[in-house]
Amino acid sequence: MIQTQNYGTGRRKSSSARVFLRSGNGEIVVNKRSLNEYFGRETSCMIVRQPLELVDMVDKFNIYITVKGGGISGQAGAIRQGITRALIKYNQTLRFELRKAGFITRDSRQVERKKVGFRKARKRPQFSKR
């Protein structure tokens, strides 16, 4: 039996996530581990579930995710965008609701590079008048 699935990619900071949406009972697997086991902190798990809770489909899909790069916050944001894109492929009518919540838009903020002569990206060495 061929199982239909919807695919979505998400990116945030330096993380990228591949999300596969299949019909099921609400199981979320990230890199072959359960969602709570992978992230540990509840805030990251909440970020991942946001698009599903918004459209009332928490228990409708099993979600399989592979995510690479970045840290906890970036990976959670990338997964959220991937789930959003997969939901839109599943049902186009959800697009307006997800757009209004701001889940479709890619968060383009990146880490600013360190400049030569500065201690960090913008922190200058201490200024001495005399």
Curated annotation (Swiss-Prot):
Question: What Gene Ontology terms describe what this protein does at the molecular function level?
Answer: RNA binding; structural constituent of ribosome
GO terms of biological process kind: translation
Q: Which PROSITE patterns match?
A: RIBOSOMAL_S9
Output the Pfam families linked to this UniProt entry.
Ribosomal_S9
| Entry GO terms, CC | cytosolic small ribosomal subunit
Task: Give me the segments passing through the membrane.
Answer: none
Which keywords belong to this entry?
Ribonucleoprotein, Ribosomal protein
What are the coiled-coil residue ranges? none
Specify the superkingdom.
Bacteria
Q: Which PANTHER family match?
A: RIBOSOMAL PROTEIN S9, SMALL RIBOSOMAL SUBUNIT PROTEIN US9M
NCBIfam families on file: PRK00132.1
Query: Under which name does UniProt file this protein?
Result: Small ribosomal subunit protein uS9
Q: Which organism is it from?
A: Buchnera aphidicola subsp. Acyrthosiphon pisum (strain Tuc7)
The gene name reads: rpsI
